[in-house]
Amino acid sequence: MHPKVLIIMTTPYSKSDSSRTLDAYFHFWEKDRVAQVFSRNWLPNKGHCEQMYQITDSALLRKWLHQSDSVGKIYHYDEMSDTDGNKVLSDNSTVGFGYKLGAKHLPIIEILRGMLWRKKYWCTENFLKWLDGYKPECIVYNFSNHLFTQQIALFVAKRFNIPIVAVIGDDYYFNDRFSLSPAYLYFRYKFKKLTEQVLSGNCSAVYCSDKIRDKYNNFFGINGKTV
């Protein structure tokens, strides 16, 4: 029997999205041993997970505006879509515009999103109950430039004293550029600090190329592998 894995990435599994690579990792895994936390406002598809937990920007915004206390939705396998594709859940036009703006991944947008994704908003009693019921034994973290996904990975790893395996496909950590923009400098500072926490201690990584592998392994002193 395989260890219980918790995948943390922004998009849920889909054959038509970049997340389809997850099937290569977990195709033969027992479905009750794989769960995922994701943030996109998509209806998840049936795939490698028996259950998923969704936290969206719009739910956090409504809580931040005191319009709703409900943050986080649990999807069991029979509630997921039978057909592949990224079906967007209904949101108002303002929220929809916010998602389009957020897709640009500008430093100022990620900083503002980081304010929205404060722990007191996403770390709800419902989320903790779901985590404790699942009891993950390992985190698979899809490396990205989102500050909030790093924070969630670190929180869960500490709560259960479990390792993090980072899935890394680029050398974004090393791609500093000259800038006088306070937003860019602050974002890079926060991103690099969180990345250093993720890749320190009880962590390993998988890479898409030997070049990327050597860069991270040598810099962080980890023993990741190319897949």
Predicted regions and their residues:
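N-terminal subdomain of nucleotide-sugar transferases
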Residues: M1-D84, G224
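Histidine-centered beta-alpha loop that forms part of the nucleotide-sugar donor binding/catalytic region
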Residues: T10-T11, S144, V167-Y172, V227
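Conserved nucleotide-sugar donor-binding subdomain of glycosyltransferases
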Residues: Y77-C138
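Short N-terminal targeting/anchoring amphipathic segment
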Residues: F127-T149, P163-V165
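Membrane-proximal helix-turn-helix segments that form the acceptor-binding/catalytic region
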Residues: K129, Q151, F155-R159, L185-A205
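Active-site proximal beta-strand in glycosyltransferases
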Residues: F155-N175
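Helix-loop-beta element that forms the nucleotide-linked donor phosphate-binding surface
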Residues: R213-V227
